[in-house]
Amino acid sequence: MRIMEKLTRRQFLGRGAAASAALGAVSLGCSPKRESASDSEPGQVSCRRDPKSGQEVSVLGYGCMRWPMTKDAQGKDIIDQETVNELVDYAFSHGVNYFDTAPIYLQGLSEHATALALSRYPRESYFLATKLSNFNPNSYTLEFASAMLSDSLSNLMTDYIDYYLLHSVNSDFENFRTRFVDNGILDYLLEQRSKGVLRHLGFSFHSNCAVLSQLMDFHEEYKTRTGEPLFDFVMMQLNWFDWHHSGNSNAYAADLYAILEAHGLPVMVMEPLLGGRLSDVPDHIAEQMKEKEPGRSLASWAFRFAASHKNVLCVLSGMSRMEHLRDNLHTFSPLVELDEQHKDFLERMAELMSSYPLIPCNDCKYCMPCPYGLDIPAIFTHYNKCVNEGYVSASAQDPEYRKNRRAYLVSYDRAVPRQSQADRCISCARCVTDSHCPQHIAIPREMMRISKYIEELRRSNSM
């Protein structure tokens, strides 16, 4: 039974201003920050036409992996449903109609929280995207896939899903066949698509060009044999840094995008901000970007870059705060695409940024929970923030060493509780063997490196 009444657009127009007061965040040392571009009311976001359905999809999509959390009476983490409703109301009133979730997001709570917020509106007025998250080899079965789809339909309170994805294709083609083809899962999903339970079928991609080319060959073979496409869309990581300067073992985004464009597949963009890192770039890079366009936020550069490619249908953003939502709505209402001169400028900024020793963590939390209590994303986020702000000294001979040492240690203890810090890591490797980090980070190795660095800082502090 739906626990909230349906609202019309007219009933909630203007509610967003009140919602912003309900959204707060605690600033802890080197925690991420982000600026808003304007206090004026945004307009309606730009849309693009889906080539298969002909329907208009908002170019700005809502990523539902980072809904705000709160505590219940027993101190347990739960999604702040009231705030989620306010965010969805404000986004929907400005034309955002694409909402992306997954069974594993927020410890399995995201799908239903998203559905509760959206269930107050006519089902045909928005698009739902969710995923088959069969990461563990024990889940490579048709029974698991069928049950997960059934659970998603139930959690989302719907009898169809607009965009369904094979979640995180991040290995070789043989692994893809093992996960989805040889066990009958792909045939089952194609059958569900033919029945209308799934309106579009695609996959999210985290591997290299060779694997993507093999997938596209597989796609074309199916299309030749059946007369219809195997896949309707692909989700990929696309941003101005990864375009030519991928910070991990994945291929450059430009090359992956070119393959998809050649095959005519629409692209859904994930990580346009690299987990927030492109809205919090090193100071001297931020200064140049602000000088180039004083009225634009750093985040708006990233979103406009991602959306300035003609084959991109939708750009996702995990907007957990009203100020971020408003800023993004300004960017997309209407979308002003970047010209070549602005793209060249971002390429120069990417070259500068590539010289920084950052860890390519996007805070997806696929590595969590750690069996030994580490807050892996928080440790990496803090480290990257301090690198950007110049608080990571190369040696004790650095003239700023004492100041930097204090800034790093004080902010570290504020950002990450002692019982969750890097020195708790025992290199059990559960975070890499069970979670399949999309960024291919050698998490235990990085934890040892950070732990050693912090130990040196603390030792020198006592001398």
Q: What are these regions, as identified by a protein language model?
A:
Residues 391-430, 459-463:
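Short Fe-S-cluster ligation motifs
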